[in-house]
């Protein structure tokens, strides 16, 4: 877990208010469809029932467990399921009309036809991106007790297969005084279509200029693939010398198995992943122009290019993608009730799961978007 996210959450809310752009994974398990206990007092005054389903990013699986418990406690006549199948699968399921919302670590891509497909799925109405789940991405590795610093340039070369040994001269130069083993580096990447992969590739391109591929499918020419966030974390924990990119919460869960998190040099010296360093990076958060204040797409390229001292800009924004209109009456009520519950539970339990609770004007803007869903 990353501790003390309160300052970070406050910064996130402030940045959303001042941004010039205000006018922005495969685990095959469901988070569950059984009803949680409790919430009887709230349920006495609220009549929401029926089945609500979502699918997509595995990065927010733990967050969805928090939200599901709160939602079913408040609305005992509702049923909820979230399948953490990866961002790509979630978008396809949403656009195909088989689920009510999609979780995606990447915004819908117009050049891939996803925006138009979503509009068609929503009965001719726009789909909106609700960035409700925010968390940093860790560079997790397995190298015994060795603490490692890596520059963004070195990181790109590792994942391209240009650096293959832990005692490579480039890594030595960034870790003076550290006894680096002559050990093969095993790159672990997401084999499914993943928004985490999409964002990590955007990050490598923005931060280094030494990365050519893009999209949810990570290149498979180097290393070994694994499905979902938990899959790559498990793989790194089981292979001495392995390295991967994964949401911080999953990396922390594997610390007892020998997994460590690298300090990254974004241009002003090695930075440890912490609530403070994430908060510094969020000072530069901005949103893209989308034509609607309720469609909130983060300008990730600008964020990833940040090299301010003490900042950790490798941050994942997980969107929950919904129809702005076009649901039937029951589904609209369920969607609005669920996401109001999500926004009412940006709390300590969410922090403990490794995420950044949103607050302030950003939270207010999300609430306005949910209220505007028809």
Question: Where are each of the predicted segments found?
Answer:
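Flexible, solvent-exposed loop/hinge segments that line or gate ligand/substrate-binding clefts
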Residues: 213-348, 353-374
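Bacterial N-terminal signal peptides that target proteins for export
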Residues: 1-12
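C-terminal motif of bacterial Sec signal peptides marking the signal peptidase cleavage site
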Residues: 20-24
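N-terminal segment of the mature folded domain
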Residues: 27, 32-172, 233-235, 242-254
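Second-shell loop/turn segments in exported
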Residues: 50-56, 79-82, 126-127, 140-146, ...
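Extracytoplasmic ligand-binding site segments that recognize negatively charged/polar headgroups
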Residues: 136-140, 145-234
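Extracellular/periplasmic catalytic domains that process cell-envelope and extracellular macromolecules
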Residues: 94-96, 121-124, 130-133, 149-150, ...
């Amino acid at each position: 877990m990353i501790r003390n996210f309160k300052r970070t959450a406050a910064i996130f809310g402030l940045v959303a208010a001042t941004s010039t752009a205000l006018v922005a994974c495969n685990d095959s398990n469901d988070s569950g469809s059984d009803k949680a206990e409790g919430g009887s007092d709230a349920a006495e005054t609220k009549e929401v029932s029926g089945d609500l389903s979502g699918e997509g990013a595995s990065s927010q699986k733990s967050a969805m467990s928090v939200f599901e418990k709160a939602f079913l406690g408040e609305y005992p006549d509702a049923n909820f399921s979230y399948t953490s199948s990866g961002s790509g699968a979630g978008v396809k399921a949403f656009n195909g009309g088989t689920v009510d919302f999609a979780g995606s670590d990447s915004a819908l891509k117009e050049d891939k036809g996803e925006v138009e497909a979503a509009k068609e799925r929503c009965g001719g109405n726009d789909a909106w991106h609700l960035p409700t789940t925010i968390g940093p991405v860790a560079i997790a590795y397995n190298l015994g007790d060795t603490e490692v610093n890596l520059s963004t340039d070195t990181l790109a070369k590792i994942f391209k297969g240009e650096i293959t040994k832990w005692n490579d001269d480039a890594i030595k130069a960034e870790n003076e005084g550290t006894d680096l083993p002559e050990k093969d580096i095993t790159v672990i990447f997401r084999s499914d279509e993943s928004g985490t992969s999409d964002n990590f590739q955007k990050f490598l391109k923005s931060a280094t200029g030494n990365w050519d591929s893009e999209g949810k499918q990570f290149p498979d020419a180097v290393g070994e693939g694994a499905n979902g966030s938990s899959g790559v974390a498990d793989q790194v924990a089981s292979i001495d010398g392995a390295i991967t990119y994964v949401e911080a919460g999953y990396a922390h869960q594997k610390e007892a198995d020998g997994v460590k998190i690298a300090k990254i040099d974004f241009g002003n010296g090695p930075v440890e992943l912490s609530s403070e360093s994430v908060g510094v990076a969020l000072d530069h958060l901005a949103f893209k122009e989308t034509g609607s204040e309720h469609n909130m797409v983060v300008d990730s390229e600008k964020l990833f290019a940040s090299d301010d001292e003490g900042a950790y800009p490798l941050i994942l924004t997980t969107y929950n993608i919904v129809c702005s209109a076009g649901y039937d009456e029951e589904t609209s009520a369920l969607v609005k009730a669920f996401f109001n519950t999500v926004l009412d539970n940006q709390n300590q339990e969410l922090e403990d799961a490794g995420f950044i609770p949103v607050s302030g004007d950003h939270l207010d803007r999300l609430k306005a978007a949910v209220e505007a869903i028809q």
